[in-house]
Every structure is written in structure tokens, then in C-alpha cells.
Amino acid sequence: DIYREVYHWLMENPKKELLFVGMGCQSDGFRKFSEIKGVRDRVYIVDIICHGSPSPKLWREYAESIQKKDGKITYLTFKDKRNGWKAPTAYVKVNGAERPVKDYVKVFYNRCALRPSCYECPYATTERKTDMTIGDFWHIEETIPDFYDPNGNSLFLIHTNRGEELFEKIQGYLDYRLSNTTQCWQANLEAPTQKSEQREEFWNDY
């Protein structure tokens, strides 16, 4: 219902603009929706460099198993940077205590549980119709070493005039360097995540 909620918010706030952020499929779907509804000029649309989206069923049942055993989940992060950018910590909070979710993360990175469409994603390219793409700037220590931050560097790809406008609004708050698509190459800007050879076996066992 998020598209309708956004549209209703824009109708209720005719003098305001809105920032929509989502995965490539979500953001391009919203782009088409906003064009049909005639509100494209009031929204900035940003998508994320995406590894793929896991099965909602898998997370729902995994979370339910934790809550049934330990209590209600009140917080979730997959990228806590206490150990640095390259070794993120994933955990949930239950009753104020941190509980690791390593099993779920392992399945995610093993490429067993992504949605079938993710393995054929048409948005795994630098040519996108959103205003801007954001993501981790992996390997920046090799291409722009003097700008590397062990806590992480973000990558912005600007696609449209709206994207330029958005960047101009925020650039005063940023420390940034200009790059190019060769320097900032990321695997999921070129091709979708490959399906694991163990995917079918995983779901049969699940």
C-alpha cells in the first residue's frame, strides 16, 4: 500500500515534495506510478544497489521463532559497524538484549533464499530511470585510496536532472569525491546475484 499512501500524502500536502527510497524494482515501480498519477515532478526517487531480496516468509518465520522463544523483537540491524564496515554485526534486540541472527545472514549471503525474480533482476545495471542510486562503495581503497574510510564509503550515481537537484540540496553536508563507473564498479551494477546451486536443496529441506 506504500504507493497509495505516498500519493495520498502528496495530495494532502500540495506544497511539499517527497523522497522515495527502495530497491530497484520498488523504485522503478513507484516511478511509473508517479508518472501515471501526475506527481513525478514532486518526488525524488532513489534506488539501492541490491544483492537481492530474501523470501518474506523466511524472515517472518525466523523472527517468529525468536519471539516465541525469547520475547518480542524491538530492534533489528544487519549492518552495525562496531567492528568496521567490512565486518558488520547483525542482531536483533529482545528484552533489551542483543541476539545475533547469524543463521539468517548466512542463508542470505549463500544466495539460497532470494526471490526467484532477483536472480533475473533487470535493474542490475548502471542505466536506471530513477533519479539517483545509492550503495556501498566497495573497493574504494583500491580506486580512491586517499578517501577510504574504514567505517564505510557510500556511492551515489546520479541519473536525472531531479537527481542533480537532490544532490545539490545535500552536498553541503557531505564530504565527497567525483568518480566514474570504472572506478565505482560493483558486481550488482553489472549483473544480478547468481542463484546458489544449493537453493533447491535448501527449500526442499526447509
Q: Across the structure, where does each feature detected by a protein language model lie?
A:
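Short active-site oxyanion
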Residues: K15-L19
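Short, acidic/turn-prone active-site loops that include or flank metal/cofactor-
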Residues: D1, D47-P54
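Portal/gating segments that form or line small-molecule/metal binding sites
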Residues: D1-M11
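Long, compositionally biased charged/polar accessory segments in the mid-to-C-terminal portions
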Residues: G71-Y206
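Short, charged, surface-exposed secondary-structure boundary motifs
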Residues: G52-E61, P145
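A short alpha->loop->secondary-structure connector
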Residues: E35-I48
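Gly/Ser/Thr-rich loops at beta-strand to alpha-helix junctions
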Residues: F20-F30, G52-P54
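Short, solvent-exposed amphipathic alpha-helical segments in soluble enzyme
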Residues: S34-G38, Y62-E64, Q171-D175
